[in-house]
Amino acid sequence: MVALMWGLEVVDAIAGGSLDQYGIEPRDDDGLTGVVAAPFLHAGFGHLIANTIPFVVMGLVIAFNGAMRVLAVTAIVTLVSGLGTWLVAPDFTLHIGASGVVFGYATYLISRGAFNRDALELAVGLIVVLVWGTALLGGLRPEDGISWQGHLFGAIGGVVAARVLRRGRTPAPV
């Protein structure tokens, strides 16, 4: 995924930013493609670098539970972040970047220990809070050029992923 993000940003830079139009456009039917595309698109290399570092670090921590786990968390967080942004962000705005996924990874790591009742996972969650806590709270503050909606719904998606993917989950009787 990271290679795709970087490859697309190189193409986007050469093309004068023309790929950014495929981001999330709230409540516009054409903007729904951005739900999947937005995490791969960035507003320049600075934006991409800012997302790449936590994406890789937290993604690797999640991947300790296997490739399928990181793919499942990524899918859930991407959908919740993207659809939430599409539903509530202001009209005539464009939302791009992987920060919704980054926020989702963080809250997944923070909350999974509680759902799994696992001391090691709780410790990992505490480390995430200590390292990224200020950025998480700051990213929820409305600010021009920042998709706080993507951050908020990404964070919600991380908690949803931790709940849905918890260990020992038994199916409900039919």
Model-assigned labels for residue ranges:
Residues 1-174:
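A detector for small-residue-rich transmembrane helices and their helix-helix packing motifs
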